[in-house]
Structures are given as structure tokens and as C-alpha cells.
Amino acid sequence: MKTQLNILLGGLGLFALQGCKAPQAEQSVQPNVIYVFPDQYRNQAMEFWGQEGFREKVNFRNDPVHTPRLNDFARESVVLTSAMSNCPLSSPHRGSLLTGMYPNKSGIPLNCNSSRPISSLREDAVCVSDVFCNAGYDCAYFGKLHADFPTPNDPERPGQYVEDRVPAWDAYTPKERRHGFNYWYSYGTFDEHKNPHYWDTEGRRHDPREWSPLHESGKVVSYLKNEGNVRDPKKPFFIMVGMNPPHSPYRSLDDCMEEDFNLYKNQPLDSLLVRPNADSKMLKAESARYYFASVTGVDRAFGQILDALKELGLDKNTIVAVSYTHLTLPTNS
């Protein structure tokens, strides 16, 4: 019997773990590992918290969102309700996630932003990806990194920034700063969700004009299928997927998929904003529809990765984790 282990780290307070443990003698095959972590995803925005077996375990009311794939994932898991981020801020959290260090040690005490003091992942730090690489894994990173300070190192325009002006957030990560990730499809930070861009392993830029979580899940599926011989099929793999949504903005259909927005567009705001201190009359209250639509879209993108694992027969020997950098308050952002 092979071991299957699923992990779900939700917001600042959920840790789910599933698997039937095989006898030690049967665990000779190294498991694959996939770690998916959307940005700015609130703990309450998971539908299963309102379902039997879960709602009794928490002291909050869940948001009225549709997350069918996370619901199923949680049902197959042991859910812990008190996991938390030591630093629920984008870049510092990522530094701690990668290195296991507190932000004052990882090199990233602040969000990586060119208008602030330099904050950037230490090149000499041993990251989790370095450990996997040294253990014989093929390592791949997809999506938002936000762990490097913007510098003039555009691979296609040496000596220039990745934008025509000094970017506030976005940055290119060269090979020597990738910490064991031998497959790369990533960017620093860029918040146009339907107009994303990525740099690949060789530093080529791609502008796919596709909602970023669905594009990234498609690239992960391609990697799993080993299209283009991008990984060694004899090696186990370690994958990290840094989805940007449901990070702001959440103002219009430029920020989410219309099919997901349609699930919420006709619902009264009073029924969407269920926290007792929420003010549905605020101008920004309308953002809840777009935020929840992004949550549902991220759920769908995550489901595509799970479907590919099952289709390829990789699901029984793959550890899957879902985590979030930090929560958000849609009407306050």
C-alpha cells in the first residue's frame, strides 16, 4: 500500500492532514510534494467550515463561498484549527516559509518594495527547496514569489529593470537565487490578474493573457505530464505554486472569472457579509462579490491539479499542501 498524504493549511488557523500510514518497510519510494499557497486568502472563505463535522470546531461563521474542491479535500483530511503564520505579511511570510527562519533572519523583514529599505531572501540561506534538491528531487516553482528586492537585472535587457521605470514590486529572480528550483515559471509581484507575466527557467518572458491561477494550474499539469521533458520522471518532484488571487484588486471582472462572479452577483450584500461588524452599506462592500469569485476560481484551479494527479496515477504517492500567506478584509483593503 502506498502512502497518500494531503495537507491543507488554511488562512491563519487551519491545518489538515490525511493519509493511511503504510508500514515502514513499504515506504521505500520517496513521495512527491506539492505546496499550493494563494495570497491573501481569508480563513473564513472556505465553504466546508459551515458543514457538519467542521462548524462545531471553530468559533466563527464561514463566508458564503463556493469551494467544492477544498470541501472534498478537507473531507479526506484531519483538520487542525490552530495553525498560524508567524508573520502574516506577504514577503516576510514567504521568507519564513522558504527558510524556516523568522523575518529578521531570513533577509525579508519587510515587503519587498523598491521604495523601502532593501528586503530580499538571503542568497546564503538554506531553503526547503535546497533540501529537496539535495535529496534528489526535481524542484519546480510556479507563480508569485515576492521574495526578492527589485534590481536592474532584466534578463532580456541587461542593466535595466523589468519595467521601463523602477518597479515598486516586481522583480526577476536569476538562476543563482532560485535555491534548488531547477524548473522556474515565476515573477515577483504583479497585480493585473488577467494580464500576468512570468519568466521561465531560461529567463524568457511570457505574457499569456489568462487569469493567473488557471494559467498556473495549467502549467503545473503540463509539468506533471512532463510535456517537453522538463523533469526527470525517475526522480520525485517538489512543486510550489504561489497563486496571487484572491489578493487585491477585487473591483471588476478584470480581477476574476465571470463564471465565478455570476455565483455571487445577484446575492444581497447583507447575505455575503456575514460578520457581525461588517457594514454592507460601505462603498467597498461590493468588493466581496469579486473577492469570493476569486476564491471560487482558485478552488477550481486547485482542483485541476488534483485531477491531473489522479489521472496520471500520482495521487497515491504525493503529499499535497494548501496554505495561505495571510488573510484579508475585503471591505477594508
Tell me what each language-model feature is:
Residues 4-13, 20-327, 333:
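Formylglycine-dependent sulfatase
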